Amino acid sequence: MSSKLKVLQVIPRLDYGGAEIGCYDLAHYLSEQKSKSYIATSGGKLTKYINKKKVKLFKTPVHSKNPILVILNIFILSLIVLFYRINVIHVRSRAPAWSCYFAAKITRCKLVTTFHGTYNFNSSLKKYYNSIMLKSDCVIAGSNFIFKHISENYP
């Protein structure tokens, strides 16, 4: 049994933005540290720069809010976690966070979420949708401002 850290990062698209660059950088950093690094995404401009020898890339519809695709992603992510013996799922967005949450429960994998921005919550339904980002084993706030936002709005 291998004790090597194996991290699956899940992000809707790998285009150019703070969350995306963070995902890209962490994936390559983990591989340099002799950990196994995986990314699940629907695609994006940064995918062509992923070092495929160091980071395993899965193209899946994790960007979708369609309930059928969210359910499909639960099964896809669960299979990835089980097949590759992933230790940690790290999700950086609300839409895929729902799939990751249930995949982590099914597989008993640790779940980390990164809260990169403030989310509107004009209704209690929207606030509930956003709250998935706090239902993990570890929540990372992207800044002190985001930490304050989380503390004040999601007690």
For each feature predicted by the language model, list its residue ranges.
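Membrane-interface segments of envelope glycosyltransferases acting on lipid-linked substrates or membrane lipids
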Residues: 1-155
